Amino acid sequence: MKHFEANFDGLVGPTHNYAGLSFGNVASLSNAALVSNPKAAAKQGLQKAKALADMGMVQGMLAPQERPDLYTLRRIGFSGSDANVLKQAAKEAPMLLNACCSASSMWTANAATVSPSADTRDGKLHFTPANLVDKLHRSIEPLTTGRILTATFSDPHYFHHHSHLPEHNSFGDEGAANHTRLCNEYGHAGVELFVYGQEATNPNAPKPQKYPARQTLEASMAVARLHQLEEDNCVFIQQNPDVIDQGVFHNDVIAVGNQNVLFYHEQAFLNTQHKIDEIKRKLDTELYFIEVPTAKVAINDAVKSYLFNTQIITLPSGEMVIVAPTDCQENPAVFAYLNELLTLNTPIKQVLYFDVKQSMQNGGGPACLRLRVAMNEMEVAAVNQHTLMNDALFSRLNLWVDKHYRDRLTTQDLADPQLIIESRTALDELTQIMKLGSVYQFQR
């Protein structure tokens, strides 16, 4: 049977804006109040997804969240008509309105943690939506995320969906952005790497001092239990607190893995060699640990360019390719390193550059925009086929974006009642295009 690693990219929502909501994310904060272009953002994401599909990759799309989130605004005391709720919130609590209008669900690396059937005791693919409790604007996502994932991976014979973890900082969970999987072949049992920022229940354990550690060891271990993983299939690694304090808010900003390759910065982890030895003990295959030294790429350059927030994909030919943002080309140190990497004795043979600047300016590169799902051909056949990228879906979604999206949006525009109508009309049509059913609150 054939096996694949599919990428499910987040479709950028109609309210994509730069509100600077993500403390600890340097790009998000430094670009606050820029004028955004939701139409361009959505099209940049679609272009990247279509390019991967054209390379022979299994490529899907995940629908965005409903925004503005009037349900949350009403829960916190704003009332009256929809227009009045927006008007009140804009006047009395503009930052809360901004949080309820974020299009951050585009970064589906934070949507969930996924364990393939080759690793789990029950032989099913497991999904746990991330609770994202560290950030208000993301903490309102998990329920709808769960509905969208269930509508996309709907066959219970193959897919096991869990609820998100308890909504408490002890179980802070940021999903696949802090998780990667190493294996020989996608269909073989592998080792899942769970990267955490702190131990919530151990006050003496190392933790960052400036920025929050969004992922806890307790959350990572809970997900591993839910997914029915054996101890021999898991390695729990602490991210270096010092790099979190330099803007590395998720592990996918400082490391990325694919099959038998782990590509990471030398400052990425604590006790690096000890953990590499553990991976080698648990995974009996030839492994490539590509460590990027600070002398060649400083942490600041890695964060600005998102060198590690790249995708490493294996093409049908077996060749590994890095999918990088054009920002990596524009940074001399990073571009020089990537060119050098191609001359080294590793499976990575090519770097492809994509313009995802609308996402990058909000702090999300190519790897943020995708959720990896390793599947066999029967599982791929069981996926909602209307969510899989092909010529027809690409054309239809581009027309849909042209029809419904603005090409200019400021934070002041978020209080425009017309934006609610535009967004709901667009999402209602999208659920019909992608055959998702009533996943949104306004449809229920």
From Swiss-Prot:
Key words, A-Z: Arginine metabolism, Hydrolase
**UniProt keyword Transcription regulation, yes or no:** no
Q: Under which pathway is this protein filed?
A: Amino-acid degradation; L-arginine degradation via AST pathway; L-glutamate and succinate from L-arginine: step 2/5
Is Glycoprotein included in the keywords of this UniProt record?
no
Q: Which Gene3D superfamilies match?
A: Succinylarginine dihydrolase (3.75.10.20)
Q: Which superkingdom does the taxonomy of this entry point to?
A: Bacteria
Q: Which reaction does it catalyse?
A: N(2)-succinyl-L-arginine + 2 H2O + 2 H(+) = N(2)-succinyl-L-ornithine + 2 NH4(+) + CO2
EC number(s) recorded for this UniProt protein: 3.5.3.23
Active site location: E174, H250, C368
Kindly list the positions annotated as binding substrate.
19-28, 110, 137-138, 214, 252, 362
**Which GO biological process annotations does it have?**
arginine catabolic process to glutamate; arginine catabolic process to succinate
A GO molecular function assigned to this protein is: N-succinylarginine dihydrolase activity
User: What does the annotation say about its assembly with partners?
Assistant: Homodimer.
Spell out the NCBIfam families in the cross-references.
Answer: arg_catab_astB (TIGR03241), PRK13281.1 (NF009789)
Protein role: Catalyzes the hydrolysis of N(2)-succinylarginine into N(2)-succinylornithine, ammonia and CO(2).
Question: Which family does the similarity line name?
Answer: Belongs to the succinylarginine dihydrolase family.
Q: What is this protein called?
A: N-succinylarginine dihydrolase
Upper classification of the organism: Bacteria, Pseudomonadati, Pseudomonadota, Gammaproteobacteria, Alteromonadales
**What is the gene name?**
astB
